[in-house]
Amino acid sequence: MRPIPSLQNNFEYTDLTEPMILIPNVWGLTQQLGIFGVDRTTQESVTLEEITKSFGLMEDIHRGARHQVGRDYDRQMRTFAVPHFTYDDYITPRDIQGKRAYGKQELETLDQVRMRKLERLRGTHAATMEFARMHTLVTGKPYTPNNTVGGATGYDWYQEFGKTRFEVNFELDTPTTNILEKSELVYAHMQDEAYTGGVVGDVIAICSPEFFSKLISHPTVVEAYKYYASQPQILRERLRARGFDARYREFYFGNVLYIEYRGGFQGRPGGEKRRYVPAGEAVFIPGSGTEDLFKTFFAPASKFEHVNTPGEESYAFEYVDPKGEFLEINSETNFINVLMYPQLVVKGKAA
């Protein structure tokens, strides 16, 4: 600790302690699960070609009769504009002149201010991506709060691909509900509606705290694990995350891995929290291979040096005023999260 003039009496000194830093919670479950694959486009839009394969069922005919004939696969093209997101900051001499550095007894420097600005910038980009991906999973729409692309109402992946969102009410407030039957509805729907050429072998449910708590305390679940000696021992200890960080409780039941996601966007400690998963809801997705089912497309920056180049996840540029009066930091990211197979995202409700 170093002595500094007291704030109450300029003729006295007090010790400056180590700083107490309050940091917003940082969430990134979609990144940890690897739900979205990443693709990079060189243009400001992406065009998806949908090819629908088909097979025929042969019938017997008399010899010499006209043969059954085949046909080619169906296909159609869809084009979607990539939204443009920007976040800028700047530094002036007044931000440094005569200022004490954060948590130190030295004068502020340009490098320290720049480092803080870039740290906040990186955090903003990461928070935006997590919020955007969860928004797409929960609503079936890309994150475009101002609807700058997709018309007045924006894109809706269920409408764009001609699918209907499947929902299952787990009726967790009813003590006699058969949870396994409810889980089987989700599993059967994914198997029947996959159309990916693959097999849905397991399922992940990203749950709100309310859904998760009602699930693990439901009488049929408690009874099923009453005499189960192995992990998880839900009757004797708090569930713990396996493979993720300890904030994410998880519970495997009925071929579904339920993960509690308490996360939400909160710009500053104590500020308003915009939850990722609405209260009492859960989002069910296939447990593996989702990087080909759900995609994040990145487009290039709006700069000459990046024209027609593969898009990066984020860009940052620094410009110094020729007169030395300010330093400007520009950043941007251009992305769209697409549910290529929206029918494989199932909405679950606690009641």
From Swiss-Prot:
It is found in: Virion; Host cytoplasm. One of its GO terms (cellular component) is host cell cytoplasm. The keyword Aminoacyl-tRNA synthetase does not apply. Keywords: Capsid protein, Host cytoplasm, Late protein, Virion. The keyword Transmembrane does not apply. Pfam families: Phage_cap_E. Signal peptide: none annotated. Its main location: virion. Disulfide bonds: none annotated. Homomultimer. Assembles to form an icosahedral capsid. The assembly is primed by the interaction between capsid assembly protease and portal dodecamer, and major capsid proteins assemble cooperatively to form the procapsid with the help of capsid scaffolding protein. Major capsid protein forms hexons and pentons of the icosahedron. Viral genomic DNA is packaged into the procapsid through the portal vertex. The packaging triggers a dramatic reconfiguration of the capsid shell. HAMAP family: CAPSID_LAMBDA. Belongs to the lambda phage major capsid protein family. This is Major capsid protein. The lineage of its organism: Viruses, Duplodnaviria, Heunggongvirae, Uroviricota, Caudoviricetes.
